């Protein structure tokens, strides 16, 4: 909106559809779908690691979660996470943990359910308080691939008419603010 060059500005529709205006349920759904996209079957794993989206998320991992996202969670939730699988410190596993805790909410310990709350609002609030940049950076990351693939799973979150402007802005800012990371990650 504040870009001096009109070609770099999102149209009003793009601004109105920004995740800041989504309800909590839509935000959680978006993050869960992103996790699903990044956790495709093993035959696709090499392709997923080469996605611009994956590179962008990992390039911004410290901005999203610090050195280890697991340390930002309450100890009861950390314990609950370890019961079902091993999560590493990468952003893909952070998204997977959020997705799994939402999809298997009834299987959580009473303590973990109390921490996360019973509603979509309280659930999202917990994760956004622990990781304030997660939604924004994930949205930027997904825009990079949606621009190219028009993936139907993400069509409720993006519109092709403005996605190329959004993706171009994400790339431009990444190059300007993190040149050492963009070149090292082949971004």
Tell me what each language-model feature is.
Residues 3-29:
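Terminal C-lobe "cap" of eukaryotic-type protein kinase domains
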């Amino acid at each position: 909106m504040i870009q001096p060059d009109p070609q770099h500005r999102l149209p009003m529709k793009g601004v109105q559809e920004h995740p800041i205006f989504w309800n909590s349920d839509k935000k959680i759904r978006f993050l869960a779908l992103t996790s699903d996209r990044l956790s495709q079957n093993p035959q696709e794993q090499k392709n997923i690691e080469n996605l611009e989206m994956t590179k962008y998320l990992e390039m911004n991992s410290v901005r999203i979660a610090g050195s280890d996202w697991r340390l930002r969670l309450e100890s009861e939730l950390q314990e609950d996470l370890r019961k079902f699988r091993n999560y590493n410190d990468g952003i893909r596993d952070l998204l997977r943990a959020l997705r799994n805790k939402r999809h298997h909410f009834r299987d959580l310990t009473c303590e973990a359910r109390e921490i996360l709350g019973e509603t979509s609002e309280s659930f999202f609030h917990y994760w956004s308080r622990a990781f304030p940049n997660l939604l924004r950076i994930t949205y930027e990351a997904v825009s990079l691939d949606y621009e190219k693939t028009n993936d139907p799973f993400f069509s409720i979150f993006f519109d092709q008419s403005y996605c190329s402007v959004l993706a171009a802005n994400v790339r431009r800012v990444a190059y300007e603010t993190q040149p050492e990371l963009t070149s090292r990650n082949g971004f």
